[in-house]
Amino acid sequence: MTSKVPVFRLDDLKSGKVLTELAEAVTTKGIFYLTESGLVDDDHTSARETCVDFFKNGSEEEKRAVTLADRNARRGFSALEWESTAVVTETGKYSDYSTCYSMGIGGNLFPNRGFEDVWQDYFDRMYGAAKDVARAVLNSVGAPLAGEDIDDFVECDPLLRLRYFPEVPEDRVAEEEPLRMGPHYDLSTITLVHQTACANGFVSLQCEVDGEFVDLPTLPGAMVVFCGAVGTLATGGKVKAPKHRVKSPGRDQRVGSSRTSSVFFLRPKPDFSFNVQQSREWGFNVRIPSERTTFREWLGGNYVNMRRDKPAAAEAAVPAAAPVSTAAPIAT
């Protein structure tokens, strides 16, 4: 583990025992490891194995049934290389070399009842931990939240995604394309990330800390916490939203480089509003031509091209699904 990233126990965050240390971490780095979160390895393992089994063994018909044609939706299944963080952030044209499943509060698409039972329980447990972390982060910097109570603020519109990063092919090794997923900050208040380690020891996840990207290895019993752009906006610029990325392995580490990450974005309510010019001054790419905008509008403009274009035949095979509730807008 890099010495630049602190580690906190959830109980210590909730009790205020490490209030000063937490405030320093979120205002200067925007990242820390979280231990004793209330979730145990079995919680993560069950959700991960259920999802990866579907990725590997689900039929094409089953996958089409939980794939939305709506380019803006973040629900259900996204096939390998269907998304591109690099295109959205204007840092490249390469795809995210991963397969993904997403769910939220409502409008979900589950492959079967067993999958739904496992994932609904996992979602609820991650949501509880994320709210506890967000309360601690916001309290540590004395966030005013424009008069809104913190408990009300964290009852919001979260998103849970599991990404499976398979071993990369020869044309996606680091010598050909350095990244599996482009550098980005999260559109969330905070984000919880539970990652599995690559079997060959390669560390794929990195975060920008003190001006350089540092490795974020898997720690037993720990999750990574990223502070997101909404955390910055909600605290008047106090909380830092760091950029992070996923590296590609070199040719000598290609075999054994598969990994997963369960990512829980604590996103605000869709009508969360903020000052556009101020957000730009804090480094966020908000191009909406108005003085103020909402989280819903920001997502709609910023992530419309998250899903990469596919051949017409492939797109035609994806049926249009029922519209997702407006309480569940586009994903990070």
Curated annotation (Swiss-Prot):
UniProt pathway: Antibiotic biosynthesis; cephalosporin C biosynthesis
Cofactor(s) demanded: Fe cation; L-ascorbate
InterPro entries xrefs: DIOX_N, IPNS-like_FE2OG_OXY, IPNS-like_sf, Iron_ascorbate_oxido_reductase, Isopenicillin-N_synth_CS, Oxoglu/Fe-dep_dioxygenase_dom
Ranges of residues in domain Fe2OG dioxygenase: 155-268
Keyword Iron attributed: yes
EC code: 1.14.20.1, 1.14.11.26
Alphabetic keyword roster: Antibiotic biosynthesis, Iron, Metal-binding, Multifunctional enzyme, Oxidoreductase, Vitamin C
Signal peptide: none
One GO molecular-function entry: deacetoxycephalosporin-C synthase activity
Residues noted as binding Fe cation in the record, renumbered to the chain: H184, D186, H244
Highest taxon, organism lineage: Eukaryota
Reaction(s) this enzyme catalyzes, per UniProt: penicillin N + 2-oxoglutarate + O2 = deacetoxycephalosporin C + succinate + CO2 + H2O; deacetoxycephalosporin C + 2-oxoglutarate + O2 = deacetylcephalosporin C + succinate + CO2
Biological role stated in the UniProt entry: DAOCS catalyzes the step from penicillin N to deacetoxy-cephalosporin C, which is used as a substrate by DACS to form deacetylcephalosporin C.
Family according to the record: Belongs to the iron/ascorbate-dependent oxidoreductase family.
Protein's recorded name: Cephalosporin biosynthesis expandase/hydroxylase
Organism: Hapsidospora chrysogena
